[in-house]
From Swiss-Prot:
UniProt-recorded name of the protein: Large ribosomal subunit protein bL9
Stated family: Belongs to the bacterial ribosomal protein bL9 family.
GO biological process, any: translation
Primary role: Binds to the 23S rRNA.
Origin species: Crocosphaera subtropica (strain ATCC 51142 / BH68)
GO MF assignments: rRNA binding; structural constituent of ribosome
Domain of life: Bacteria
Amino acid sequence: MAKRVQVVLNESINKLGKDGDLVEVAPGYARNYLLPQKLATLATPGILKQVEQRREKERQRLLAEKQQAEGQKTALETIKRFTIRKEVGEGEAIFGTVTTSEVAEAIQAATNQEVDRKGITVPDINKTGFYEATVKLHPEVTATIEIQVAPL
């Protein structure tokens, strides 16, 4: 039976692993494909130490992002209500609809913090009144805000 070789991946490879993973592969696969294409590096103690340091930095970065998102969530839920003014027709029906871009602009105007409009979920709004929207600030952090649609 052939001996397996440990390599550290430099890129994500389908069905093998993602960047920074330590994997065992056949020596021929490593020697003939992974190493010449610079898709992997032989696993030496120095390389393993670098990989561990890179993972720790990534963990710290993700933790900092989550803490920043928690702070944004607190700010949004403290303000709680954001007002959007729209032109109104008969029976409090608004012209057009309230878009996620308009909600993002209202949040930015009130908090001076940019929010990605793609993370905002707004119900179908076609009348004036109060509506709830969710803002996804991070994969693990979601804030619920209230949108007031008022006449212009």
